[in-house]
C-alpha cells in the first residue's frame, strides 16, 4: 500500500475557508429512545469541524451535492451520513445536528446531537495529526451539552431521563488504524499491530466509562470499515489491501469480544456491537445485488474523479474514505433493528 499517497489523499479534504449552511430538522417523536448522541469520526460527523483550522473539513462543494438543497454542511459524503440515518431509523429526526453548529436550536437538544469529528480517533496522536476534536474533548463537549440541556428542560429529572434513555453511537478506530498506524507510522515503533489494537480497545472502554459516569446507559459501538478496500487504499493496484483489512478485522474482533463482556463492568448499561466491516464488504463483493456498479473508484474528489460522477447512488464510495449515502442506507436497516432489539 502506498501509505503516503493515501494520507495525501485524505489531506485533500482540507479547505481553510469557513462556510456555514444551516440545516432544518424534522422531528418524529415516535422513538422508544429519548435521543441519539454520536461520538467519534467522519462516519458520524455532521459538521463539527466547520469552524476548526483542520485538514479534515468538507464544508464545500461537491460535498453535500445530494443533501437537501445541495448544501455542503460539513458532512463527509454526498448527502446524509450514518448518524443521520440511525437517528431517523430510531424515530427521532432525519438529521442529527452538529453540537458545535453555532446555530444549533435548543429544541434539538432533547432528541440528540452529534459530537463526532472527522479525522478524529481514540488515539490523541490521530486528532493532533488531522487537527480534529479528540474523543476526550468530545466528552468535554458532552459535559457542556448537559449543562445546556438542564437550562432548556428546566429540571434535573427530565434532563437525566434524556441522558439515561439515549443511545450513544460511537465510531472510532478507523483513523487510528488507517492513518496513525499504517500511513504515518506514528505508533509502529511503540506497538505491534495486535498490541495497538489492544490499546484502542482499552481507550474505547475509557470513553464508555466517561460517558457512563455522566449517566449514559445505552451504547452502540461501531467497528471499523474494511479499511483495505477504501478507494484510497486500492488506488494503485485496484485490489483491496489484505494486510490492512486483516488489521481492521483483528481490531473489530477484539472490540466485539470486549463489548460483549462490558455488562459486568458497567451495571445497568446495555451494549451492542455494530458491525460495519462485513455489511460494507458485502456491498464490495456483490455490488449488483444492491444496485451498485463501481466499488473500487470513488465518485468524487480523487485525481481520476476531479469532476464528480453523475450518479453517486451507483457507487459504494463517495470519496477516498467515505461511503455514499446510498451505501449507508443499504446497510442501515439491519443495524437499526439490532440496536432496537439490544438497547430497548
Swiss-Prot record:
Would you list which residues are glycosylated?
30
GO terms under cellular component: extracellular region
Q: What is the lineage of its organism?
A: Eukaryota, Viridiplantae, Streptophyta, Embryophyta, Tracheophyta
Specify the enzyme's EC class, one word: hydrolase
Look up the domain of life of the source: Eukaryota
Q: What residue range is the signal peptide?
A: 1-24
Show the disulfide pairing.
Answer: none
InterPro entries in the record: GDSL (IPR001087), GDSL_lipolytic_enzyme (IPR050592), Lipase_GDSL_AS (IPR008265), SGNH_hydro_sf (IPR036514), SGNH_plant_lipase-like (IPR035669)
Q: What is this protein called?
A: GDSL esterase/lipase At1g73610
**Does Heme show up as a keyword for this record?**
no
Q: Which family does it belong to?
A: Belongs to the 'GDSL' lipolytic enzyme family.
Name the Gene Ontology molecular function terms of this record. Answer: lipase activity
Q: What species is this protein from?
A: Arabidopsis thaliana (Mouse-ear cress)
Amino acid at each position: 500500500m502506498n501509505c503516503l499517497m493515501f494520507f495525501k489523499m485524505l489531506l485533500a479534504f482540507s479547505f481553510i475557508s469557513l462556510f456555514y449552511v444551516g440545516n432544518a430538522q424534522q422531528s418524529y417523536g415516535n422513538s422508544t429512545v429519548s435521543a441519539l448522541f454520536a461520538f467519534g469520526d467522519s462516519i458520524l460527523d455532521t459538521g463539527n469541524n466547520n469552524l476548526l483550522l483542520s485538514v479534515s473539513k468538507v464544508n464545500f462543494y461537491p460535498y453535500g451535492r445530494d443533501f437537501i438543497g445541495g448544501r455542503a454542511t460539513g458532512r463527509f459524503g454526498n448527502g446524509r451520513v450514518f448518524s443521520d440515518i440511525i437517528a431517523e431509523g430510531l424515530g427521532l429526526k432525519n438529521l442529527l445536528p452538529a453540537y458545535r453548529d453555532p446555530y444549533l436550536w435548543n429544541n434539538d437538544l432533547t432528541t440528540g446531537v452529534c459530537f463526532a469529528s472527522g479525522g478524529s480517533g481514540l488515539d490523541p496522536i490521530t486528532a493532533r495529526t488531522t487537527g480534529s476534536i479528540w474523543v476526550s474533548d468530545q466528552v468535554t463537549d458532552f459535559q457542556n451539552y448537559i449543562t445546556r440541556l438542564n437550562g432548556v428542560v428546566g429540571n434535573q429529572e427530565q434532563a437525566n431521563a434524556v441522558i439515561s434513555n439515549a443511545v450513544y453511537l460511537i465510531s472510532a478506530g478507523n483513523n487510528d488504524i488507517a492513518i496513525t498506524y499504517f500511513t504515518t507510522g506514528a505508533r509502529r515503533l511503540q506497538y505491534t499491530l495486535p498490541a495497538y489494537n489492544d490499546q484502542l480497545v482499552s481507550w474505547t472502554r475509557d470513553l464508555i466509562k466517561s460517558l457512563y459516569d455522566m449517566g449514559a446507559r445505552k451504547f452502540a459501538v461501531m467497528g471499523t470499515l474494511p479499511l483495505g478496500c477504501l478507494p484510497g487504499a486500492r488506488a494503485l493496484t485496484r485490489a483491496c489491501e489484505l494486510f490492512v483489512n486483516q488489521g481492521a478485522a483483528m481490531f473489530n474482533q477484539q472490540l466485539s469480544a470486549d463489548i460483549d463482556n462490558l455488562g459486568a463492568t458497567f451495571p445497568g448499561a446495555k451494549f451492542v456491537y455494530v458491525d460495519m466491516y462485513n455489511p460494507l464488504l458485502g456491498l464490495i463483493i456483490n455490488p449488483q445485488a444492491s444496485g451498485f456498479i463501481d466499488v473500487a473508484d470513488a465518485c468524487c474528489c480523487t485525481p481520476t474523479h476531479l469532476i464528480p460522477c453523475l450518479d453517486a447512488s451507483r457507487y459504494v464510495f463517495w470519496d477516498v474514505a467515505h461511503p455514499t449515502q446510498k451505501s449507508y442506507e443499504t446497510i442501515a436497516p439491519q443495524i437499526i433493528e439490532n440496536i432496537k432489539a439490544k438497547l430497548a
